[in-house]
Structures are given as C-alpha cells and as structure tokens.
C-alpha cells in the first residue's frame, strides 16, 4: 500500500471514464445529368474517405451510358463512422455506379458504424448501383440504410450484399447488422419500407435463419419493363447456377421487383449477383454491362 508524506494511505486516483470511439461524419454527393447527347457528372462533392474515378464509356452501343467507380481511400469502415452518399440521376441520365472491391467493416463499439445511401432518380433516368459486398470482420457493428426516391418512369437497379470474414480463421462473428430500405415517391409516400436486424452469433449459430449460408444479398429493380428475361424462374436459375439460393418477388405498391440471395461465401454470392445483374441490366438499359476491371 502506498503512503503519503503524512504516513496516511494515499487515495487511489479516480478511474478515467472510457470514452466511446468517435467516428468520421462525412457526406458525399454525385449528380448525373444529360448534356451534349451523353451522361455527365455535373456536380461532385467527394471528401475523404470517398474517392471516385472519372466517368468511363464502356458501352460502344450505348455511348451515353456512363460508368463510375466509387472507392474508399481509408481501408474500409471503422468504429462509429457515419458515411452518407447521395446520388441523383437527372432526367435522361444513364449511369452505372460500382466499386473496385469489397468494403471491410472493422470492429465496432456500442455506437454502430453507419452507411447511408440516398438516391433520387428522375423520370426517364436510369441508375444502376451495384457495389461489391460489405465484408464484416469480427465485432463489426453495422447499420445500413438505403433511401430511394423515384419519379414515375425512372429505372433503377440497386444491390446490397454482406459477407463475413475472420482474418484469423477462427469463425469469430460480427456483432450486429441492421438493414433498412425505403422506396418513396417524390411526394414522400412510402411504397416499400423494410427493416431487419440480426446479431452475429445468431447469424452463424446452429439455429441461424440463414441455415448454413454465410453471405446475403438483395437487389431492387425499379421500372422493370414487361420482359420475359425478368421472369422469376429465369432469374432464379441464373443465380442458382452460380451456387446461390434465390428468391424473387413483386414489391408492394407496384414498386418493382425484389430479389434475395443466400450463398455459402462472398465469392459465390458475388457470382450469383453478377449473373442476375447482367440480365436485369440488359433488360432495363438495352445493352449488357461493360466488362469492368477490378
């Protein structure tokens, strides 16, 4: 026991409170418009850690269709981050936004890591947003929110996917995953609203609602035309052939189509998502997606 100069026991110093991690609060914005007979990125606000490439022209048969890669310059999402991405497709714009690789979600804390995506799609516009999977590391606590506002006549493909990975190979689970989707009219009327939550232990446990699958993906198709290629059995067959378990359903209020895919791992999920995406992309845009180097 430590003694003070007057031979009395010293009082222990009060413990310093443990503060929760403070994450980044960042908002990026992309606006695509029709100009000069093609699609141009008319406005961009891309602060760190967001990074984008220039718009590529990868469709010789549809030179007005732009492709843009969205990248992370920081190595993923970290504890208590709150990143927001706004994308607007103005009338007549046709754009495909993708990523260069999957995004790692690192160990979190009590406050979730948040990723919000807000899309505004005008009439006669086409937007395809299909990022690579979010990769949940052990202890990751992630909340994902996607909000889509679509005018009548808008066409869109929006995908979202998650997979688990333990760098030590010990099958340690993530902490928690929250997913939210809202599709609304320009007047604010909600057409679709979904919310889901699952703990990592339940995700990988013996009674998991995922069964033995460890990767999950969704696809929303808005403004889908009457096209035989979009029939549920054909889409399921394309994805199932890649090793996924696939469900296709009509969204409420005539909003479009909804697809859900389960897979044993992220690689299989990506293959199944890509197989379905190619079919839907061609049906909505009139051309197949360009080959994207990653």
From Swiss-Prot:
Keyword Zinc: no
GO molecular function list: nickel cation binding
Predominant subcellular localization, coarse grouping: cytoplasm
Keywords per UniProt: Chaperone, Cytoplasm, Nickel insertion
Region (Disordered) residue spans: 1-20
Source taxon at top rank: Bacteria
Compartmental location: Cytoplasm
HAMAP family noted in UniProt: UreD (MF_01384)
Protein name as catalogued: Urease accessory protein UreD 1
UniProt source species: Methylorubrum populi (strain ATCC BAA-705 / NCIMB 13946 / BJ001) (Methylobacterium populi)
């Amino acid at each position: 026991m430590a003694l003070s100069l007057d031979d009395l026991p010293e009082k222990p110093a009060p413990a310093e409170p443990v503060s929760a991690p403070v994450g980044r609060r960042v908002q990026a914005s992309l606006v695509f418009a029709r100009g000069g007979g093609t699609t141009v990125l008319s406005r961009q606000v891309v602060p760190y850690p967001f990074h984008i490439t220039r718009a590529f022209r990868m469709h010789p048969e549809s030179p007005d269709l732009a492709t843009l890669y969205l990248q992370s310059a920081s190595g993923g999402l970290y504890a208590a981050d709150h990143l927001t991405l706004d994308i607007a497709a103005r009338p007549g714009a046709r754009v495909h936004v993708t990523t260069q690789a999957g995004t790692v979600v690192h160990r979190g804390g009590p406050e979730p890591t948040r990723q919000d995506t807000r899309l505004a799609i005008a009439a006669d516009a086409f937007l395809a947003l299909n990022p690579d999977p979010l990769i949940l590391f052990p202890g990751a606590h992630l909340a994902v929110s996607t909000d889509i506002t679509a005018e009548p006549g808008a066409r869109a493909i929006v995908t979202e996917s998650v997979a688990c990975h333990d760098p030590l190979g010990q099958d340690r689970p993530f902490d928690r995953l929250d997913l939210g989707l809202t599709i609304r009219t320009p007047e604010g009327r909600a057409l679709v609203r979904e919310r889901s939550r699952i703990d990592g232990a339940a995700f990988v446990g013996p009674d998991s609602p995922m069964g033995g699958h460890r990767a999950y993906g969704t696809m929303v198709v808005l403004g889908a035309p009457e096209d035989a290629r979009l029939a549920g059995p054909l889409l399921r067959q394309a994805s199932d052939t890649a090793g996924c378990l696939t469900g296709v359903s009509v969204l409420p209020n005539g909003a479009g189509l909804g697809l859900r895919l389960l897979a044993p791992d992220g690689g299989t999920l990506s293959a199944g998502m890509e197989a379905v995406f190619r079919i839907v992309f061609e049906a909505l845009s009139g051309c197949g997606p360009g080959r994207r180097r990653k």
